[in-house]
Amino acid sequence: MPLRKPAPALVTCLALLAGHPTIASASHAEDVFFEAPSQLLSPVTRPSTISTLRKLGVSALRIELSWHTVAPSANSMRRPAFNAKDPADYSWGQYDPLIEEAHRLGWRVLLTVSAPVPLWATANPRLRSLVTRPNAREFEEFMTAVGRRYAGEVSLYGIWNEPNHHEFLEPQFNADGTPASPRIYRGLYQAAYAGLRAAGIAHPATLIGETAPEGETYVRGPIRPGSAHNVAPLAFLRGVLCLDSSYRRAGGCSMLSPSGWAIHPYPNQAGPLYVPRNPESITIGALRRITGALDRAGYAHALPGSLQVYITEFGIMSKPNRYQGVPVAQQAEYDAIAERIAYSNPRVASFAQYLLKDDPMPPRGSRRVAFQTGLEYASGSPKPLLAGFPVPLTVTRLGRAYALWGYVRPARGATTVTLEGERRGSHNFSVLSLVTTDRRGYWTLRDPTTEASWRVRWVSPGGTVYVGPAIRAY
């Protein structure tokens, strides 16, 4: 599948950054939060996984902490007798050693505290739903325990995973078809913030949102419990902030003061330049929508002005996913383009990679969701993205020349990379240029040569050789 033509705004941005100087000139640095739950939460695979992530240049983790997993008597309809604010009354399991190891390595940790929840902490335990109307007061006390347990080791607290998605919070819509989850979530966010304050954290660094990329604004017809409807992220934002469709205050809600608004802007098979038709959806190619919405919310005094955007979960689905997967070579290209888009936006504070290893594919006919966004297949064999992730590269056609952007993720300071090109029909790469990065490892270059593909080679100070995959122009 050929790469699609880039959006005009992106071409303009790349054109401004392209030129003879080889050092990147972006105005901000980004965290890249890596998430590999199956491997990192297992004591068997954690050491080798940490070793792999260090080689890849990872220095920040996103960890999802399930309230249900650590709570006492989580499947009981009756709340047990315990001190919900005391960390000693919970079973933290493998979260403790993982967070301790990340702290020892000096890695930033985003801890997203989320569903499923204890059955006794729902509004109606008889429903046997672990995501329906969680009790905000109970959540506040739990967050006090979380804050006391991990203060000093966690850099950011994410409040709920994808609260606009029916698998993580119910109900999403009221019986009349209007969104229900935004107001439920607002209560949970405020409870979490108060709980962290009660833990002795004077100014908790929290992320609000963590929204799934697409959904609906209104649902027609009767809404049944458990129906698979999700609230569109911008409609969700307005509901959380008590704003009407024109971003005017629609109630007596006070301003919220999070550290940033978090999104999960997954694209579809069309790739990272895809812009959804629904103007309420947010993919990586539509970041302008979220920054515009945050500006309007700031103008309405529902949020602080110029709030930063955090991409906290992201990946490009590859084959063998039957529905959304792209070829694995294209996965590496698309992932680099997505990171380039995020890097180019000064309001974006972080990027993310969801999964080191693919989920196993479910059998045909199964309704189970599986992600093939990893750097490796489920078997552990590498995809091109395993080589591309530490040294992402994008190549954009600009008239008769090409604008190149790259990043040496494992570098700790300015370094030199070797740019190689492959002419059409040659099947061999030759050296085109030696490029100096900035102190964070980023670089740009204008290349007048006509190549079929490009790649980056870098040798670390310790002698490890990194060779990225072949990348085509787009």
Per-range role (PLM):
Residues 441-445:
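Short strand-edge motifs at loop-to-beta-strand transitions and within beta-strands
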